Structures are given as structure tokens and as C-alpha cells.
Amino acid sequence: MPVSVSDSFVFRNIFGDAEIRKIWSDENRTQEYLNWEAALARAEASLGIIPKYAGEEIQRVCKVENIDFSKLEEETINIGYPVLGVVHQLANLCSGDSGKYCHWGATTQDVTDSATVRQMIDSFKIIKGYLEKAIELATVLVIKHRETTMAGRSNLQQAVPITFGFKMARFVATLRRHHQRLCELLPRVSVLEFGGACGTLASLENKGLMVQQKLAEELGLLQPEIAWHTERDRIAEAGCFLGMLTGTLAKFATDIKLLMQTEVAEVFEPFKANRGSSSTMPQKRNPISCVYITASTSFVRQGVAALLDAMVEDHERATGAWEIEWIVLPDVFVHTVGTLKQTVFLLEGLEVHPSRMNENLSITNGLIVSEAVMMALAPKLGRDEAHDLVYRLCHLSIQENKPLVELLLAERQVTNYLSKEEVTSLLNPENYLGSTFEMIERALQIP
């Protein structure tokens, strides 16, 4: 019976999808073990290390449907690792004496690590697809809302004007950096593990590296320069990438949650009848995808910390740290795909309300562009004096609930240097966007 949201019948397609779950399933992992054993047999048979007939027979029986999972569970509980249980069944499935050549010169971790690498590669293909879709959809929003002026916020308060396109362009630029990181990461992760007991391949005498090369070619992996049984930087780096990627998605979801607040109401998740509704408050439209994203990404970040712990291993084969990866990797990959899936859903139907953004720009009576006035006065009064003057008038605007323009035009220190037309122009949010449009163009042109 499922106990985790990753495989719960109710929650599994919220926090992941069927494709990623299949990759990390018992059946697929075991098939990867069998793929490894078949590839090893082919490589060793081609080099004359085991008989050709044995290589062919081992390959013939390396199918997951031949595995008795009840027996495998029983042996794994007793041994502590599933690979030997698979090898025992494999040997018994082979005809004649072929079974005695199974797993020749290998060790459990060689099989497990290589299978994990192949699972990660397949997982990264899914992640890359979702990531590219998110970039495409976010770019559409950048272009559409390039000039949609809104309040930029600092410490949750209105700061200076930006455009929604600018906000989304920053998101696109970050996603593109993650795409670049993923492309750079894949060659470092896609490496075979095959070193035997302590990494030296001593059991294969002078043919160890030849077998290693052929095995890597058979599995579509890179040959390692040296064994990495207790050097876990590859796995940790993969985990850190997932943590960074999902951290970016959580930042995006957090912004959407805040923009959905009743008092703000500038952006909303896609509408679907009853989605995000409350059991007691009929008016509610909760940011449900954003909630799933922020919850899942928190879990992923904790998993990354565990993967970093797993780097601290003893000697050439470790006592316990390695098993952390077994626990963590399936769920962090599933939850990463889940967050990407929810992000794509958001981007496909995100509701943007320019009129509400424009309304919110005016709620401070012009204070959102007070910096523009200060900078216009600074060359005349000096920056500090200009700051103090505008600060005083902003405070007065708040106290008396008066438009800033009215107070500025009543202040001699302002009118001595700025005309009414200049003050009015300075207080137009659309005139204080700086290099917004140039930066948007640069963000979109990044290859």
C-alpha cells in the first residue's frame, strides 16, 4: 500500500508523473541491473574472458519478467542489497553451466551505481523537456507584457515601477542558466561504475580496463578515469542542480502567490471550476499549484542536504552513507518533475491583469516614483539634501493622505528648479523604467 505522496493514488500525479515514477520503480531499477549484467557478459565474451555461449545465455535471460520479486525481497532483507539476489536468480535461470559466469569480476556497487546513473540520465531527459517548455511559455509572457507597467517590490513594499515583462524576463534568464547547467552536468554524471571490490579491477588481471571500456560503450556511458565508489561528487552535483532548479521554481511560485492576494490581485493561477476552492469559504481561489511547488521544493532542498551528507564516506567502500542515495534520489527526482509540471501548468494559463497593476501603481499617491524626483533634484541640491526633502514630503503625503505632486508643487525648494510639467512627468511611472527594455532584449537574446 502506498505511503508516500510520490506513489499515492490520490497525490502521485500532483507531485510527479507516471514517466518519472516508472524510471525509479523497482521493475525498472531491476531491469537496469539486468541490462548491466547482460552488457558485462557481452563485453567479457568478446574478450574471451567468459565463453561466448555463456555471454549469449546470460543476455537471453536478462529480462525483468524472469525475476521473482518475492524471492528478491526475501534475499535483499537477508543480504542487505538487491544485486546479489538478482544475480542468484539470473544464474539459476541460465542453462548448462552459463550461470557460473554471471557477474564475473564485478561487485554490487558497480551494478547499483551504473543503474542509478542511467536512471538519472533518463530523468534528466524528462526534466530538460519540461524546462524547455517552461522557457518557451515564460518567453511568450515576456513579449506579451514587455510594457505592462507594475510595481516593483522591495521588502514586500512598493519600490519603483517595473514591467511584468521585466519580471518574467528575469525568470527566463534564470531558467536558461539552469538549462546550461544541465547540459554541462550531464557528461560529468553519465559515467560508468566498474571497479570491482576496491576499484582496482584486480579480479580481471590485465584485461580490467578493456572490459571497462567495452562495458561503458555497451551501456552508452563514459569510461571513468578511476573508480568512484566513495567519491560521490557526481551524485551530489546532480542533487544540487535539482535543488537550485526547484529553488527558482519556488521563487516564481512565491511571487505568484503574493500577487494573487486579494489586496493585490494582479496575477492569478489558471482558472478551472472548483480548482483551489475552499470547503467553507465560497469566494476562495487558492494558489494551489504554487502551494504544491513551494512544498515540493522544500522537500527537494532537504534531500540535497542528505546527498551532501552522503559524500562523507569511509575508505574505498563505505558503511552506510551510500544508502542515503537510495532513499533520497527517487523522491527528489519525482518531486522535481512534479514542480516543473505544475510550473508549466501555471505558465500555460497564467492570468495577468494589467488594469489592476495600473490601479496599484496609484495607491501610494505617487510615492512609488519619489526616487525619480529625488534624482532630478540631486544635481541642484546635492543628493543628501534632495533625499531628506523628498523623504519629508513623502511622510507628509502619508500623514495627510495627499498626492505627492500637490506637496511637491507647494514646496519652493522644488519649484525653484523643476517646472510643473517636469514634476508631473517625473511622477509618471511609465517614465521611470530605466533600462528595463534593453535588459529584456538582452535576456531574450541569450543563447
Swiss-Prot record:
In its keyword annotation, does this UniProt entry include Cytoplasm?
Answer: yes
Query: Is Cell inner membrane among the key words of this record?
Result: no
List the Gene3D superfamilies: Fumarase/aspartase (C-terminal domain), Fumarase/aspartase (Central domain)
Write out the annotated subcellular location: Cytoplasm; Nucleus
Q: Which GO CC annotations does the UniProt entry carry?
A: cytosol; nucleus
The protein's UniProt keywords, in alphabetical order, are: Cytoplasm, Nucleus
Name the predominant localization: cytoplasm
Q: A single GO molecular function, which one?
A: carbon-nitrogen lyase activity
The family assignment reads: Belongs to the class-II fumarase/aspartase family.
Which protein, by its recorded name, is this? Uncharacterized protein C8E4.05c
Species this chain originates from: Schizosaccharomyces pombe (strain 972 / ATCC 24843)
